[in-house]
C-alpha cells in the first residue's frame, strides 16, 4: 500500500463514519452443498515417544508409536524437562530423540500425502534444546524437507511455543521413509520429533493448470511436475475465523485467520454470506478444494470508491527467497448486489507483479452466479536468498468501469515448490534482541470505535475529503504494491511455524 498506514487509517475511520459495518453477525445461511466429502485412504497420527492412544485439542485421536510398526527399533523416548502450559500434551508431551540418524517407515498406498511434522523444542534427557540441529529427508523421492533445522531457534525468533511443518509429497512405491539426520557441523547435535501426521491428500494440484506470472501481465500456463514435493507456507481463511483440521473438507488441513498478515491499517471490511445465499460447488470445484466456511466469508475493500482507488488491499507474507511459489486464491461472491458481471472487477498483484487484470468473480462463476466457489492458481518466481516479503495485493480495475470499485478475496494458500535438486530447505529465522512486534492478530476493527450522530458524520465527510486529497498527492497511480516505507517485521509463517505463541 502506498502512502503509509497512517493515511490509510484516516481514510478508513472516515469511511466507517459514513457506512455501517458490512459484517453480517449471527446470520443463518441455507445449508451449503459441498459435494462428496473426501475420505483419506491413509490417516496416520503418530504420537512419537508415547504409549497408548490420546486425543488432541481438536478431538483427533493419536496413536503412540511405542512398539508400532512405524518407529525404528531401540530409538530413545523422552519427555520434556519442563512443558509450557500453553502446549497441548498430545502430541507434544513426548518425543523421539537421537544423536544418530533414524528413519520412520510408513507402509502406504501410492499417491500424494500430506506430511506434517510437529516439534516442541525442550530439554529432552539432559539434552539442551538449543543443540538440536538436523535435517529431514524422503530418500526415495530424493527430497530434502529440512536442513540444519533448529526448532529452538525458530520458536525463539517467532515467540512461539511449538511449530508445525506441512509438506505434500508424492508416494510412488509402497512405503514412505522419513529420515532424520543430526547435523555434523554442530557440537552435541541431535534430532527429535514429537508428532508425525501422514494423511492421504485429495487431488488438489492436478485440477487446473496454474498461470506463471511473468511480470508483464501476460501470464503463461505452467505445467506442474506431478512428482514434485511442496511445502505449505500459508493457508488463510480470508475474512473469517480459523478453521481446525476436524472442520476441513479434505486432508485435515488448518486454515488460519488472515488479519495478522494484512498490511497497515487498510484491512477493508470482512463479512459473511447473505442469509439467502448458499455455497454451492460447481462440477469443476470439488468440495475438498476448500471447506464451505472459507467461501462463506470474505474480505473486500469497502463501499467507498474514493477510498478504494487510493490504496491496495494487501497481505504481506514472509517466504524463503529463491523458490517458486504456487499461490491459490479462493473467490466467491456471497452478498447482494454482486450478481452480474462487471459489477466488481479488480486486478491481482503477486510479489509486485501483475498476475491478473480484470478479475470478475461472477463472470468466472458463470452460469451459476452468486454463491459459487471458484479458485485461481498462479506460480510466482522469487530471486535472491534469505527471507523476503511476498506481497499479495488487490485493487479495483478502473479500465473496465465497473459498477463498484472494489475487490474481494475469500481464501489464500501459498505453497513452496521444490527446486530441481529436490530441496525445500529454508533458513532458520534469526532471533531478535528486541521483543517481537505484536502480530495484530486481534480484531482490528475494534481499534476504531463506532461513530454515530450527524455532527460526527459531517466531520467524517470533511476528513474523508481531506484524506483523499492528501493521500492522492502522496501516492502514484494505483498499480502493484511497492516496497513499504518501513519493514513489516517478522510475522509467523502460518502452518510453517505453528499456531501457539509463548505466554
Regions picked out by a protein language model, each given a short descriptive name:
Residues 2-503:
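Compositionally biased, intrinsically disordered or flexible polar/acidic segments
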Amino acid at each position: 500500500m502506498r502512502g503509509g498506514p497512517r493515511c490509510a487509517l484516516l481514510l478508513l475511520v472516515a469511511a466507517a463514519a459514513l457506512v455501517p459495518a458490512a459484517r453480517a453477525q449471527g446470520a443463518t445461511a441455507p445449508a451449503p452443498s459441498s459435494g462428496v466429502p473426501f475420505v483419506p485412504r491413509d490417516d496416520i497420527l503418530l504420537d512419537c515417544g508415547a504409549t497408548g492412544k490420546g486425543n488432541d485439542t481438536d478431538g483427533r485421536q493419536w496413536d503412540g508409536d511405542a512398539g508400532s510398526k512405524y518407529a525404528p527399533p531401540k530409538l530413545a523416548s523422552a519427555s520434556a524437562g519442563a512443558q509450557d502450559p500453553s502446549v497441548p500434551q498430545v502430541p507434544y508431551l513426548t518425543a523421539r530423540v537421537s544423536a544418530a540418524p533414524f528413519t520412520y517407515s510408513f507402509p502406504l498406498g501410492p499417491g500424494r500425502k500430506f506430511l506434517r511434522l510437529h516439534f516442541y523444542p525442550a530439554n529432552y534427557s539432559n539434552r539442551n534444546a538449543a543443540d538440536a540441529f538436523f535435517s529431514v529427508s524422503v530418500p526415495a523421492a530424493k527430497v530434502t524437507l529440512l536442513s540444519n533445522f533448529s526448532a529452538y531457534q525458530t520458536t525463539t525468533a517467532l515467540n512461539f511455543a511449538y511449530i508445525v511443518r506441512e509438506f505434500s509429497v508424492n508416494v510412488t512405491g509402497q512405503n514412505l521413509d522419513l529420515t532424520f539426520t543430526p547435523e555434523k557441523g554442530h557440537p552435541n547435535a541431535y534430532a527429535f520429533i514429537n508428532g508425525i501426521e501422514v494423511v492421504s491428500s485429495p487431488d488438489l494440484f492436478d485440477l487446473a493448470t496454474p498461470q506463471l506470472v511473468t511480470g508483464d501481465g501476460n501470464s503463461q500456463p505452467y505445467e506442474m511436475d506431478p512428482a514434485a514435493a511442496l511445502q505449505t507456507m500459508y493457508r488463510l481463511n480470508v475474512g473469517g475465523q480459523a478453521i481446525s483440521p476436524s472442520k476441513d473438507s479434505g486432508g485435515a488441513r488448518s486454515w488460519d485467520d488472515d488479519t495478522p498478515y494484512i498490511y497497515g491499517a487498510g484491512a477493508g471490511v470482512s463479512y459473511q454470506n447473505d442469509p439467502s445465499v448458499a455455497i454451492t460447488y460447481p462440477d469443476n470445484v470439488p468440495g475438498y478444494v476448500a471447506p464451505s466456511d472459507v467461501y462463506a466469508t470474505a474480505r473486500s475493500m469497502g463501499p467507498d470508491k474514493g477510498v478504494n482507488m487510493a490504496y491496495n488491499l494487501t497481505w504481506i507474507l514472509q517466504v524463503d527467497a529463491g523458490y517458486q511459489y504456487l499461490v491459490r486464491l479462493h473467490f466467491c461472491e456471497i452478498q447482494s448486489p454482486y450478481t452480474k458481471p462487471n459489477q466488481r472487477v479488480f486486478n491481482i498483484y503477486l510479489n509486485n507483479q501483475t498476475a491478473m487484470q480484470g478479475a470478475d468473480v461472477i463472470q468466472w462463476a458463470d452460469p451459476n452466479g452468486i454463491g459459487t466457489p471458484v479458485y485461481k492458481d498462479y506460480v510466482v518466481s522469487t530471486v535472491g536468498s534469505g527471507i523476503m516479503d511476498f506481497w499479495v495485493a488487490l485493487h479495483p480495475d478502473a479500465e473496465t468501469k465497473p459498477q463498484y470499485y472494489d475487490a474481494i478475496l475469500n481464501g489464500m494458500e501459498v505453497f513452496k515448490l521444490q527446486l530441481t535438486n529436490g530441496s525445500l530447505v529454508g533458513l532458520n529465522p534469526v532471533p531478535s534482541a528486541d521483543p517481537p512486534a505484536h502480530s495484530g492478530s486481534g480484531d482490528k476493527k475494534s481499534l476504531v470505535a463506532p461513530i454515530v450522530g450527524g455532527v460526527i458524520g459531517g466531520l467524517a465527510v470533511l476528513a474523508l475529503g481531506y484524506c483523499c486529497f492528501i493521500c492522492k498527492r502522496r501516492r502514484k497511480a494505483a498499480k502493484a504494491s511497492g516496497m513499504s516505507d518501513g519493514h513489516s517485521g517478522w510475522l509467523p509463517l502460518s502452518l510453517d511455524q505453528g499456531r501457539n505463541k509463548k505466554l
